[in-house]
Amino acid sequence: QSDLEKNLRKFSWAKNDPYCRGIFMGNELEWPDRIGPTIQSLPSDHPTRKWAIKELKRLGKPTSPAKLADLETLYLPFVQSFFSKCKQAVERELPGTLYLGCRTHRGPNVLGRGALGSVDVFSVNVYDSRVRSWQVPKDADIPIISSEFHFGAVDRGVPSPGLSGSWDQRQRALSFAHYLSSALADPRFVGVH
């Protein structure tokens, strides 16, 4: 928590900047599909492993050896704790600034559920022809922003189509227009960045 707050102090200028509406904390963090094997591979003195053992004990589950199924039940509380700690740090260091999540790209559905109640806006990097967020439940009352996208073309600049390729600048413009239209058509999306 103290590291989060210390790093946020570097952005103290944002408190009074009328153009800074919010802040992302992280970018495309690696979230495994299953947390059990990840926790089991951590050294015994790692904070996350210590937290997991403590939680298993609290739940009356065996801890030696911890069962993968039991560890999986900790994924949602782990994600909730992550987003909650980030939100608390933003509120303490940058009051009045929206917390925009961590710009997820890939990751399990637990991310959207775990972010509910902590993020002001759920951010997701979508390198596709249209916006989407499979992590956030359809019925969740949370705004979503597409925090990164990419449409490359081979006719100018770097000779690579990049993450979402187009043949030329015209197709690139049409791809972006389609992408933006898909965001406008989905009431959950509040913008693209």
Where are these regions (language model features)?
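Acidic-histidine catalytic/liganding microenvironments
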Residues: 17, 116, 186
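Glycoside hydrolase catalytic-domain groove-lining segments
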Residues: 73, 77-88, 92-162, 181
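Aromatic/acidic polysaccharide-binding cleft in carbohydrate-active enzymes
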Residues: 26, 34-41, 150-153, 159-163, ...
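Non-transmembrane alpha-helical segments in soluble domains
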Residues: 5-12, 87-91, 180-184
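Polysaccharide-binding and catalytic clefts of secreted carbohydrate-active enzymes
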Residues: 16-112
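Surface-exposed, active-site-proximal loop segments in enzymatic domains
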Residues: 1, 68, 157-164
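Well-ordered, non-membrane alpha-helical segments in soluble/globular domains
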Residues: 2-6, 81-84, 169-178
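Substrate-binding cleft of secreted/luminal carbohydrate-active enzymes
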Residues: 20-22, 26-27, 163-193
